[in-house]
Amino acid sequence: MVTMTTLRASCCRLTGRTAAGRERGSSSIQMVILMPALFSIMFLGMQGALYYHARTVAIAAAQEGARAAGSQNGTAGDGISAASSFVSDAGGKDVLPGAHMTGSRSATTATVTVTGTSLSVIPGWSLAVSQSASVPVERITR
C-alpha cells in the first residue's frame, strides 16, 4: 500500500534530481559573464597605473627643465634639453610616447611644459598628459 510518507519521499527524490540537473552548466555561464568583467577591471587598473606613471615622469621632467632654465646662466633651450634628457632617461617612448617640450624664460620666471600621451592597454584609448613647472630665475643680489 502506498502511503503519504512514501509519496512524499519519492516526490522529494525526483525533484532533487531534476533540480540538480537544471544547475548543470551554470558555472560555465557564470564564467562567460564574469571573466570579461574581471578582465575589464584589471585592464582599467593597469591603464590607470600607466597614466599616473606617465604623468609623474612628465611633471618631473618639467621640474628638471624649469630648474635648468631658471639657473643664473640658463636659457629656455637649456630647460627644453634637460626635460628631453630626463624623459629619455626615464624610458622615453616606452613611458611617454610623443613627448613634446616647450619652454620660456622671462626676467623673473622660467617655465617648461611637457606634453605627450600615456601608453595604452585598451585599444583606441590614449590619454593626453600635460604638465608644467615654473621657477623663479636666479639672479645675483648684492
Predicted regions and their residues:
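Short, conserved structural patches
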Residues: V2-C12, A76-R142
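Alpha-helical assembly-interface signal, strongest on the long, hydrophobic N-terminal helix that forms
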Residues: V2-A82
